[in-house]
């Protein structure tokens, strides 16, 4: 009789180890991958000094960036631009979404010093706009919302002119408690990604619920009507354009005014495959339709991600 696999606390499980814990449908490591089209090629910067400087700053303060942990294709561009998205509450997620490259496992307890370290790092880097995200922490009673609030409070103590965008998980089953934690220290922009269409949620976001996510965005907006809410979607996972447009309309119906829409890229052979590469002209059409729907800001393009040029989008600039 075989013994059940037991995860060790604080250990990162990725790729084959991550998908072997609980088998994920539609993943075949031996599958033939779609060839990337010409518009999906990234030109790396010639000078990596700025990139290394940001990485060193993160390491010095013991912080994580989602740029590295999720293998974002824009890391070189954003780091060279002097921007990064900080990932709080550790680098181990309690969920195992098969599109995501962040490690799965049993995370360590939150670091009580992290909010101060984060504030000091932002001060050292002289950042005027920051994005803070986190892994899912279904192991915590408030799902990590209190830690977000502490980070916002500490950042504002010594960086009063820095704008703060938070990209939050769905706070599963604790929406009211989470929003109560944030009420005294709200962000400047509240971001929560729907990721894709409800028909594919069971395959793409196991443990999540489309209606929960809409409820989170709706209830935050009801509490803070003057704070912009934002959400992001990936395309190329088997959805139809009509389904994406329906999700965009759901977002508008729930008060969301900022949208990001980009191409899904498969991090490894142990992740969901790309069903198709969406051409740039279709992203242009999505942006046009988003504007007609009433989105104030819509960043749509193959390499667009939730926090890609978030400062530019928040100020009303065109991102594509």
Curated annotation (Swiss-Prot):
Belongs to the radical SAM superfamily. Lipoyl synthase family. Binds 2 [4Fe-4S] clusters per subunit. One cluster is coordinated with 3 cysteines and an exchangeable S-adenosyl-L-methionine. It comes from the Bacteria. One of its GO terms (cellular component) is cytoplasm. Residues 79-296 form the Radical SAM core domain. It is an enzyme of class 2 (transferase). InterPro entries: Aldolase_TIM (IPR013785), Elp3/MiaA/NifB-like_rSAM (IPR006638), Lipoyl_synth (IPR003698), rSAM (IPR007197). This is Lipoyl synthase. It is found in: Cytoplasm. Its cofactor is [4Fe-4S] cluster. PROSITE patterns: RADICAL_SAM (PS51918). The keyword Cell inner membrane does not apply. The gene is lipA. Pfam families: Radical_SAM. Pathway: Protein modification; protein lipoylation via endogenous pathway; protein N(6)-(lipoyl)lysine from octanoyl-[acyl-carrier-protein]: step 2/2. One of its GO terms (molecular function) is lipoate synthase activity. It comes from Mannheimia succiniciproducens (strain KCTC 0769BP / MBEL55E).
